Amino acid sequence: MLLQLPEENKHLVKGLFKKRQPNNSVLWSYLYGDIPGITYVDSISAPSMAVCVLRFFNWTFVSDNADISWVEETIQEICKTEYLQVVWNPLAVPQKPVKGIEAVIPRFDFTERHEVKRKEIQADIRLIDSGLFEKCEWKDIQLLAYTTKENFLEKAFGFCAVQGEEICCECYASFAADSYTELGVITAE
């Protein structure tokens, strides 16, 4: 049976994530309440294990030293209704879940590089504000994480290289938590 930790008790699981994980700042942005998600635990009043499922691409984080059988059972139950992308830290939970509960998604990305004609431009670097946000090509990913433009502008930030009124490049610091910031730069190339 899945036990969902009430949002107001999320502080009870922060101590269960001491070992640094891949995408750690995304996890801590959730634990600090900046982005939405759900936490499943072994005990509502005194959790010793947790699985956090973020709304952001359903990224899923497993707490340090969680019992592998509990993790497997929890993930299998969640997967009955949700697609998960589990971020696995072998230093936090050394044993991987048994084969068969995961769905392997084969992926092969091939990007053929062509010479890009470059030209000198004069661009201004502008902080993303409410007006500039509306013009950004990648704003939907920020809305996926923060649900509203206002939440993004309050809890994260970004910059654009702008020539006239045209955005040449977008740069987002979407997740700034646990003393680290995830920074992504998107260019036309």
Label each residue range with its predicted role.
Residues 9-10, 53-57, 175-176:
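A short, sequence-level motif marking secondary-structure junctions
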Residues 7, 31, 74-78:
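An N-terminal domain-start capping segment
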Residues 35, 46-47, 156, 168:
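Short beta-strand-initiation
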